Amino acid sequence: MTDLEFMDHAEKLLLAVERSCDRINETTDADLDSQRSGGMLTLVFPNRSQIVINLQKPLHEVWMAARSGGYHYRFDGHAWQDSKGAGEFFACLGRDATVQSGRPLQFAA
C-alpha cells in the first residue's frame, strides 16, 4: 500500500469514528466528546477516561490506546485488523468504549 492509499483509508476511518460519536450523542445521553488534532482523535468519556486513536503513517498503521491496552491496526484490503489478533478496529473500539463509558456503544465504518 502506498502512503497515499494509507492516508485515504485512515482518514475514512477517523471520519467514521467522528460520525459515530455524533450519532451516539444524538441518539443517547452518552455525552461522548471527540477531539481531532491532525492524525489524532481523542474520545473523552464523562468519567474523564479516554481512548486515543492516531495514525502511524510510516508504518501504515492506526494505533488505539484504551484502558485495556494499546492496539495496532493494519488495513487488509477490507477492514482494519489488529496486528496481534485482537480483532477488527470498530468491534474493538465498541468493546472498549462500552467498558469505559459503562453503557453499550457501537461504532461503524
Curated annotation (Swiss-Prot):
Domain of life the protein comes from: Bacteria
GO molecular function per UniProt: ferric iron binding
Disulfide bonds: none
Keywords associated with the record: Iron, Metal-binding
GO biological process: iron-sulfur cluster assembly
Keyword Protein transport in record: no
Assigned GO CC terms: cytoplasm
InterPro entries membership: CyaY, Frataxin/CyaY, Frataxin/CyaY_sf, Frataxin_CS
Protein family per UniProt: Belongs to the frataxin family.
Protein name: Iron-sulfur cluster assembly protein CyaY
Gene designation: cyaY
